[in-house]
Amino acid sequence: MLTWTLFGLSSGDPGLMKEITAEIRTVMGNKSRPDYDDLVQMKKTRCALIEALRLYPEPPVLIRRARMEDTLPVGGSGISGGIKVLRGTDIFISTWNLHRAPEYWENPEKYDPTRWERPFKNPGIKGWEGYDPNKMSEFNLYPNEITSDYAFLPFGAGKRKCIGDQFAMLEATVTLVCT
């Protein structure tokens, strides 16, 4: 996450790097180490990390096994009735493709941390709620699957979601701030 964040910041808009540096200096003042409240205030810094997770998710594929026969909805694909899945079928979810899908993301190949500061929605996808930064809980350091209506799954979702997701964001933010 850190490598891709630094890559995105160094190869993108130079003004963005200046904004993030200014944010860190403003929040940190004369402190040498941030506390949790400092990190919560550093929204632009966290958005830079979040955008790197969108473009370069780790892992790029989530694997689940159907515990019973079911029919999966197919969203905006135009296929009616869904896809029948038999019990025991392995289901591969490509977060790499999901996070770069033009149906969900404007300019999906572009590293743009500012996309996380504004709501977005595609009215062409029936039933998709889109993303609204105002829905983020004060306890979340990144937009989770609920906030993005399952269009952003860098740590998975549901009961099988990475248990260390918030710690990973916390640790990455501290490392970026102290670098």
At which residue positions do the language-model features occur?
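Cytochrome P450 heme-iron axial ligand motif
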Residues: S137, L141-T179
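Conserved cytochrome P450 K-helix/beta-meander segment immediately N-terminal to the heme-binding cysteine loop
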Residues: I93-Y142
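Active-site proximal loops enriched in glycine and acidic residues that flank catalytic Cys/His/Asp
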Residues: R64-R65, T95-W96, R115, G156-A157
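Hydrophobic, repeat-rich solenoid/adaptor surfaces of innate immune receptors and signaling proteins
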Residues: L2-L6, T95, A172
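Active-site catalytic microenvironments for nucleophilic, acid-base chemistry
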Residues: T5-G12, T175-T179
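Cytochrome P450 I-helix active-site segment
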Residues: G8-P59, A66-R67, G81, L86-T89, ...
